[in-house]
Swiss-Prot record:
Species whose genome carries this gene: Helicobacter pylori (strain ATCC 700392 / 26695)
Predominant cellular place of this UniProt entry's protein: cytoplasm
Name of protein: Chaperonin GroEL
Matches recorded under InterPro entries: Chaperonin_Cpn60_CS (IPR018370), Cpn60/GroEL (IPR001844), Cpn60/GroEL/TCP-1 (IPR002423), GroEL-like_apical_dom_sf (IPR027409), GROEL-like_equatorial_sf (IPR027413), TCP-1-like_intermed_sf (IPR027410)
Binding sites annotated in the UniProt record for ATP: 29-32, 50, 86-90, 414, 492
Catalytic activity: ATP + H2O + a folded polypeptide = ADP + phosphate + an unfolded polypeptide
PANTHER family in the record: 60 KDA HEAT SHOCK PROTEIN, MITOCHONDRIAL
Subunit: Forms a cylinder of 14 subunits composed of two heptameric rings stacked back-to-back. Interacts with the co-chaperonin GroES.
């Protein structure tokens, strides 16, 4: 297919048009008074959202060059959401403002490479000032405030997230699911839970709930398949002398071994239960090791030179309580050493940082949460499917932003943090580097101005008023008052502000230093040929009707 090439200003102007259209659609969602955007779906009801990244993801433009510009900024919004959970609209507004200011200067003759260098230096200096101004998240109240703001000022969601984080800790897994009713709920699973239930319903100890509960139990962990009773008989005899219940976690237990265990359980000879090991392949081995560390046991594996026949009681893990239903096993109060658990947690965190696969990262985070003390499930309720999707998106965003706040700390919100940080930056740059520096200094006012405009105020007037002051002074767009932002609980995670600025500068630099674009020429489809009318020849005979 033939390609068309656009050069210099004509290329950049078309790219800018795409960025402008994306920005204009996304900017209306910004701030506590942001508006909704209605999005047509290929099937079903349209979706309604106030989430910037959801709007950005839907945008495809007909002009191929403009669309390239829009797609680049869309990627920035997505990356900001992935890394920080929030700040997508901030990143989009910043990228547009930087590109707009930069394009004006480059069209006037500034050197794009020098301008880029100045922009990078200014952004780095502002981020350093943001870090100095940040403070650690102190307690549940501040976590609630961050979550509430990220959930578009929904205090109920903010409180649910704060409760969940309080119960499972900052490394715990918090998942979001759809509730069956219209009420929001929080469900917390203490201890380590994995998705394997009992191998036989005859292991049940509570017939009403159909669960098996073992108190102060031993845990046998092995990556072997147990099919013969003689494999585990010596160990069973040793545990019987101790008078404690036993949970067997193995690759599988089948045939004679399972039958014998069930019969002895029913006769009251053994207080025992058996489940399959969680996971598959190498992940199964790692999860068995996790359980071993949590319970102070040892995985009996031939790879380690250990066999079931010669296993000692010292190899068994211990737990205060184990609850098993048909789908899940929960181990509470594992008796492993806390320093061993901490070492394992640190090891998994290192693996999370180094992996590039989203799937592997998700599975590692699940393992981390199981070791760190639990899983919380936020169940989101809504009256309709459209409302459910919109609310679920908000909860996901708020959750990620809250984790970002706990990780790196918080700064004043409402777009004021960037202005405060910029006030403390004074770089001695020259020529076109200085132009790049000044572009950033003007562009960082855009988020605050847009928040004010969406709330019905004059953006320029609000920015000027905030610039006259120092410290935590900012603009509360909810009521139009100038307040101490920390005292009012109007705060943003540092990570959100940092990543939004870094990503915006990165994409703007790429766009400003673009000198040519290449795109396919759309072929005009020929009009379909007229259908063959040959079959109508007989109409000639109609002359006889005259």
């Amino acid at each position: 297919m033939a390609k068309e090439i656009k050069f210099s200003d004509s290329a950049r102007n078309l790219l800018f048009e795409g960025v402008r259209q994306l920005h204009d659609a996304v900017k209306v969602t910004m701030g506590p008074r942001g508006r909704n955007v209605l999005i047509q779906k290929s099937y079903g009801a349209p979706s309604i959202t106030k989430d910037g990244v959801s709007v950005a993801k839907e945008i495809e433009l007909s002009c191929p060059v403009a669309n390239m510009g829009a797609q680049l900024v869309k990627e920035v919004a997505s990356k900001t959401a992935d890394a920080a959970g929030d700040g997508t609209t901030t990143a989009t507004v910043l990228a547009y403002s930087i590109f707009k200011e930069g394009l004006r200067n480059i069209t006037a003759g500034a050197n794009p490479i020098e301008v880029k260098r100045g922009m990078d230096k200014a952004a780095e200096a502002i981020i350093n000032e943001l870090k100095k101004a940040s403070k650690k998240v102190g307690g549940k109240e501040e976590i609630t405030q961050v979550a509430t703001i990220s959930a578009n000022s929904d205090h109920n969601i903010g409180k649910l997230i704060a409760d969940a984080m309080e119960k499972v800790g900052k490394d715990g897994v918090i998942t979001v699911e759809e509730a069956k009713g219209i009420e929001d709920e929080l469900d917390v699973v203490e201890g380590m839970q994995f998705d394997r239930g009992y191998l036989s319903p005859y292991f049940v100890t509570n017939a009403e709930k159909m669960t098996a509960q073992l108190d102060n139990a031993y845990i046998l962990l092995t990556d072997k398949k147990i099919s013969s009773m003689k494999d585990i008989l010596p160990l069973l005899e040793k545990t019987m002398k101790e008078g404690k219940p036993l949970l067997i976690i193995a690759e599988d237990i089948e045939g004679e071994a399972l039958t014998t265990l069930v019969v002895n359980k029913l006769r009251g000879v053994l207080n025992i239960a058996a489940v399959k090991a969680p996971g598959f392949g190498d992940r199964r081995k790692e999860m068995l090791k996790d359980i071993a560390i949590l319970t102070g046991g040892q995985v009996i594996s031939e790879e380690l030179g250990l066999s079931l026949e010669n296993a000692e009681v010292e190899f068994l893990g211990k737990a205060g309580r184990i609850v098993i239903d048909k789908d899940n096993t929960t181990i509470v109060d594992g008796k492993g050493h806390s320093h061993d658990v901490k070492d394992r947690v640190a090891q998994i965190k290192t693996q999370i940082a180094s992996t590039t696969s989203d799937y592997d990262k998700e599975k590692l985070q699940e393992r981390l949460a199981k070791l760190s003390g639990g899983v919380a499930v936020i169940k989101v309720g809504a009256a309709s499917e459209v409302e459910m999707k919109e609310k679920k998106d908000r909860v996901d965003d708020a959750l990620s932003a809250t984790k970002a706040a706990v990780e790196e700390g918080i700064v004043i919100g409402g777009g004021a943090a960037l202005i405060r940080a910029a006030q403390k930056v004074h770089l001695n740059l020259h020529d076109d580097e200085k132009v790049g520096y000044e572009i950033i200094m003007r562009a960082i006012k855009a988020p605050l101005a847009q928040i004010a405009i969406n709330a019905g105020y004059d953006g320029g007037v609000v920015v000027n008023e905030v610039e006259k002051h120092e410290g935590h002074f900012g603009f509360n767009a909810s009521n139009g008052k100038y307040v101490d932002m920390f005292k009012e609980g109007i705060i943003d995670p540092l990570k959100v502000e940092r990543i939004a600025l870094q990503n915006a500068v990165s994409v703007s630099s790429l766009l400003l230093t673009t000198e040519a674009t290449v795109h396919e020429i759309k072929e005009e489809k020929a009009a379909p040929a007229m259908p063959d009318m040959g079959g109508m020849g007989g109409m000639g005979g109609m002359g006889g009707m005259m």
